[in-house]
Amino acid sequence: MATPEKWRKYLEDYIPCSFPTFLDNEGADSKSFASVLVRLEHPYGRLMSFSNNCGVDVAVVLNVAWGIVLQAYTGQDATCFAVIAESNLNIRPCRIRFTSDKVVSDILSACQSPCSEKTGDHDIPASHLSQDGGFLASEFFNTCIWGPMQGSQMTSETQAADMNRNALNLFDLVTRVEVPRVEVDKSITRITLTYKRGLMREHQALAVAKAMERAISEIISGKERLDQFCLLTSEDRRQMSLWNMNLSDNSDARIETLIHEWCRRTPSAVAVCGWDGDFSYKELNELSTGVKHDLRHLGIGPEVFVPILFEKSRWAVIAMLGVMKAGGAFILLDPAHPPKRLRSICDKVSARLVVSSVQQADLAAGLAGHVVIVGGEVATAGMAQHVGEHDDSMDCIAAPHNALYAVFTSGSTGTPKGVVNSHSSFLAAMPVYLKALELDNNSRVFQFASYAFDVTIFDALMTLVAGGCVCVLSNADRSSDLTSAIQHFGTTHLSVTPTVARILDPQDFPSLKTIVLGGELSASDELLKWVNNVRVIRLYGASECTVMSIQCTSGPASSIKTINYETGNCCWVVNPQNHEQLRPLGAVGELLVEGAVVGRGYLDDASQTSETFIEAPAWLQELRQGSSTVYKSGDLVRIAADKSVQFVCRKSTQVKLRGQRIELGEVEHHVRLAIPSATECVVELITIPDASRPPMLMAFVLSDTDASTSSITARRNATSDAVFAEPSASFRSQIASITSKLRDALPSYMVPSVILPLRIMPLTGTDKINRKLLRQLAAALSREDLQLYQAQQTTYRAPSNDIEEAFQRFFAQALGLSLDQIGADDHFFSLGGDSLTAMRLAAMARKAKFDLTVQNVFDHPELSELARHTKLVADESQEFPQPFTLIAGSKQGIVRDAARQCRLPSRVIEDVYPCTPLQKGLLAETMRDAAAFVAKIEVPLPRDVDLDRLRQAWAAVAKANPILRTRMIFSPSYGMLQVVVREDVPWIESDEVESQELVVVGRSLVQLILRRRPSTALFLHIHHAVYDGYSLPLMFAQLNNAYHGETLAFRPASAFIRYLATMPDATDYWQSMCQGLESPSFPALPHPSHRPHPDSKATHTVCVASPHAREYTPNTHVRLAWAITQAHEQGLLDVFYGTVVSGRNAPVDQIESMLIPTVATVPCRITLDVDSPVRKILHRIQDVATRGIPFEQIGLAEISHLGKDAAHACSFQTLLLMQPTAVEQNENDFFNTSTSDANYRADATYAINLFCTLENQDLSVTALYDGNIVSTDTMQRLLQNLGKSMQEIHAAPRTLIGDILKSLHSRL
């Protein structure tokens, strides 16, 4: 009788074999079982005859067949499972190893002895495998097979039923092969597969059962080679053929032609926005044409490769487009890579010249015989000479099949290999890429990727083809201040690796619409962090397929390894050892990509190209006529019945780290060169179970100095103590030298983080290097263990001051260490840091007010040195300005003038600062009309209110909020000023409420009037210069809190005033937004000098419930709805009107709780396209509004001074205002904070004033309008059309704008 220990010994070289692993079974019952049945193609007699001829039991044939099925579906070459012996109903393990050098007859013979009925050494009764019996079979496997054996007595039906129940208690999947009790030679063999519903569905179970039938049939047909076995069913073949019926078409278009069209249509639009300056589309065209002329004179044309060497710069885009116009193919080089590697790339392409920036000219001179400088004053002047010449940039000299670019990736021989992609392959990917990412001329795409990474090519060219803006950050910001750079550019689209996304916070990027994750697998928590904020696109692909061969829009439930292909190309899964054999759905195989996106191959490497870019297999040629090239990806995947693809692993030793492809053989080659004493070397990507520690490259080196004389058996049974050598002082002294040599030869991402010396190199049972064991042993090493192998070892010294203690905390958080693991003299990178964790460290320090960059971390990696060189700076944006610091000049003079105009003693003047543009405009209107922008709000009070307590509460609110104690004056030197005074807000008791009027200049702008008769009520007279719709509820909430005894925080408005003084220049934004505006304002005034008097009112409410509404703000929906309404009324597609923005998006600390009015009135221009869907226009409106946030406080007066078009845009006569959602009343609120029509009328100065409120699912619109300009019938029609437009926008975001306009027309 066997024991668990005996099983473990028997299966020690085998990893647990768990099956099934499908992708689409969520929500299924995980406990109940179901069965499917198939019949064997051949009679049982044929099976017996074959087994007799081979000298093996029938059970052995069945076991090997099941092993073949498991190998296909799990991807494991070593499979194991349970076998039920019919003679005694015991359970025994079966192990089968499939290797390329073994034929089927050898495998059958090897399985005969352990599975023989005469051998019971490994038998265990089923009861001993239960939970109560001591240990679980699932420790080893979760599938079981049982069937008839020669010479054994057939089990009875009762015994079979009992055994089946026992098996189902132990295993997730049971396969039974049974033969009816009839004449054996003629009987039909049945295969019954019983499975847990939670693990697979019926169609999947049926496919597995049919695969078992196919495996048995292939064995008894006499096939010897496993790579000739076909487990594919006709149903699976038919399904895959349907999925892959249509290929994407080749395109004859040219990328530079598509870009040139935008240069013609929108010459003034920004094409490239860089840290070093911007280029309009006109400048992009002219400067790249200049580069083209220079390159053509130097012999650049089709199939000539031109290396481009730039730091992150706007000029790199000019260089790329210039090479393309010249007809050549470009290669982007990263100057951070070792010169030796850059030279090898230039030598590989026989580079005639290098196009370089001024800064990289010296490095470029060492790479080729000629350097063309692009950028800088001299080079720019040279390119400018070509402006005005005949622009033959669209002359077609490069054909679609010609090379567009080459990307060099890691090569197993130690030399980078160049992947060549043509114009046609890039263009084939373009339509799907633009659609998937929703790129258009409003997109601002952040170019983060290294120039050595092909994603940067797509970021640039796809954006320009769409008419968008390429945003180029600096190298310094890329490593030190990524968050700020993304914010600065108003980024809408961001492509990064999941590793980089991990250190970013979605909440920091209000303008971001889409994040593209690629290069490596995403963790589920990372996806969830992003999918709730922006669209998440996960790209799967290879440089050989123009980056994107499969794309997926992920949702919260997406598997982190699941990808979907919807790219116009075709994907197939084949036997990894034989691409002439298709795999069944759900089985593991190598992914093949077919279609126009497939590149041309490897540069000057015919052998590698022929292995990877193959002619269509025979099965594919049967499907479609004509030959096509198919790319063998080297990725092992499985495709489910819903077409989703699950990545399993790499077929070869190629891995990806932080998005970069690494051929481990290349790294091993250079490690051997750096360590001459090395006899064996293995490099592996180690994934640490601790999520806070990122994956890292490790090198395992066996040298003649450390190697022990171990037997083959010892190497097969190696443990961590036996494998790893002690890190001697001699070894540590060499680490720095070895690392330096590797950095000279390899990019930083390919340099191993740790080099581990070995005593022995462990082997598998087949005497191959046991890479899996090395990965397992290395992953189990603690941080302390790894530190022993670092070049420097320091004695622990505790931090000696507050700054060092702060940096100890930063180190701990960035690296995922405890404080006691970090000393003052510890080295950041020795503790496991890298460039990404340095970015995280810098971000933490900046939040704590330390002026720290990633460059500082690299310059001073020791904790104490970094602390010593880092300054603690005051973040002024987080502090309130000191009084009288926001205007220049003599404080005494300013105070004296303020006191005189306010008729107050100088001692009560608390502060003076400029008025906002909004306040200036409101005060000007009130000087013309005393009632303009003055609200009179009645607040009914309960009878039991304590009036003294209420008065004290109001005094507390006024004390905490200086804006309520603010007066306005005019200074000849400074214009309109705000004066904060130390006084109580006027509290007047009078029954003649209407007789109390506000005096604007030099007097209080807030009055509280207590009326006692006929009922007690509180009246608030307040000028709009000191409140807005957002701050009014805040004020009443504070009054409630103070009445109930709460202490109020001090909230001065001066921080917002300081922000206004430092706003960026808004000229470009508003001029661009208003450019070419010719539509008349709406509604038309009787004559230009007419001042509207809104004396009429209309209301309308409409239900707008929709599941699609959350992607865009209610404000965006209302803006589009009114634009459609106005466009229909005017018969124009280019409309404009005024809108009021909250202003609360400004980057001012605590702005959400300030009572100062931050609203701003701005022109809103919307150009409709009848052929565009609603979603696209919504996206454009919200994007324009988001990009306008930094410029919205400039004021209408200033905007109107920016040119004729801008002045016309400010002449609107319709104002749209989205009211804040009503604040829910608290049970302790002693008055109702809702406001009356007086609020509306205070804001209404245009011909049409629309006040919109969205509560629950209802949009309520109140219109105050001038009845002499707009008739009642017209206003009602406008409101009804507004409601109809809102409903259609919400209901169907894919509806075309033209269809909504038609529906409004049909209502007439």
From Swiss-Prot:
Pathway assigned in UniProt: Alkaloid biosynthesis; ergot alkaloid biosynthesis
Main EC class the enzyme belongs to: transferase
GO molecular function annotations of the record: ligase activity; phosphopantetheine binding; transferase activity
Gene Ontology CC entries for this record: cytoplasm
Matching InterPro entries: AA_adenyl_dom, ACP-like_sf, AMP-bd_C_sf, AMP-dep_synth/lig_dom, CAT-like_dom_sf, Condensatn, PKS_PP-bd, PP-bd_ACP
Domain notes: NRP synthetases are composed of discrete domains (adenylation (A), thiolation (T) or peptidyl carrier protein (PCP) and condensation (C) domains) which when grouped together are referred to as a single module. Each module is responsible for the recognition (via the A domain) and incorporation of a single amino acid into the growing peptide product. Thus, an NRP synthetase is generally composed of one or more modules and can terminate in a thioesterase domain (TE) or reductase domain (R) that releases the newly synthesized peptide from the enzyme.
Species assigned in the record: Claviceps purpurea (Ergot fungus)
Recorded name of the encoding gene: lpsB
Name of the protein: D-lysergyl-peptide-synthetase subunit 2
Region (Adenylation (A) domain): 261-658
